[in-house]
Amino acid sequence: MLCAIYKSKKKEGMYLYVAKRDYFDEVPETLKMAFGTPNFVMLFNLLGEKKLVRAENQEVLKHIQEQGFYLQMPPKQESLFEQFKAEQKAKQTKNKTALKVR
């Protein structure tokens, strides 16, 4: 089964999969508004050998068959502050270990 994949211009990393190109009748109005104007990316064969990167082909197919679309949300980004704290902690641990060796 071919599906059409669109990316959102409003939200980086958000993609909408529908059964046919330019067919959005099954997509709720609230989702259409939140998604913004869809930007066509490509047609994709869900039953082919290629795998989607961030979704399971069978899961996408099931959602399209049951509700007419599949919405892929952007990956969760770690807080930059949390990432900074983890890096600082790693540096401190490394420095303490280096001091003990001397």
UniProtKB/Swiss-Prot annotation:
Domain of life: Bacteria
Pfam families: YcgL (PF05166)
InterPro entries listed in its UniProt record: YcgL-like_sf, YcgL_dom
Domain YcgL: 1-85
HAMAP family membership: UPF0745 (MF_01866)
PANTHER family for this protein: PROTEIN YCGL
Protein's recorded name: YcgL domain-containing protein MS1047
